[in-house]
Amino acid sequence: MDYFCTDMTKIFTIGFSGKSSDTFLDVLNAARISCVWDIRLWRTSTYVPYYNGNNLAMILGNRYEYHTEFAPAPDILADYKDKKISWAEYEKLYRELLQKRDPLQNCNISKLDRICLLCTEKSALQCHRRLAAEYIAEQIPDIEIIHL
């Protein structure tokens, strides 16, 4: 399916690991984020309850959405965490999963500008949020990705 946006659309990514709740909100506000898309497989945090999906939904209100269509498959994530597959293999499997799911089919493309893909990892380098952002940019022309 072909998707189109007008002008240059910016999408952001953020990982909450190592960020206080105040810092997290300050970063989102400074970037003028329109909506946080939580793309974690499980939207709970044992270590930092502030980042549980229900808490984020209360704090962010209509600026929070849970998008399971961008979450990794449980088996792929488990195999990577258990070191059964390398990052390169994880990346390949996750990209194939996105192609199969076509996660943009149920998203309001006109509201993509200034969304922020949320996950746990501090760095986007080895996190599926980077891959999800790249997937969106491959599907839609004129997308700029910014990692917060």
Locations of regions flagged by a protein language model:
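Residues lining hydrophobic/aromatic ligand-binding pockets adjacent to catalytic sites
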Residues: 2-148
